[in-house]
Amino acid sequence: MIIVETTFNKKEDAESIVSFLLEEKLIACATYKNVESSYIWKGTIENEKEIEVSLHTSESLFPKVIENVKEKHPYELPRITTIHPLYTLPEYEDWVNKETTN
């Protein structure tokens, strides 16, 4: 299992992409967190409230998840990162793999 993470400034944008990924069986689950981000963008320090989304997918599908998130993301340069958990409950990983198999 791999977790793909990204951020959005509007929950509607996050939900739209998550719905697409779920319908296409590219992810089994998504979680949302409210976060505050500070970063330098085009020479200016920005402070924004964002929604961080964690997308749970199988190892075989994470490249497709990244491709779709990048293509549909409203940001000019989205943060898209992956996390490979040190441990995942085997039953949970089995469920993720089952739900993301066509």
Where are these regions (language model features)?
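Positively charged, small/polar-rich N-terminal and surface patches that mediate targeting and assembly
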Residues: 1-102
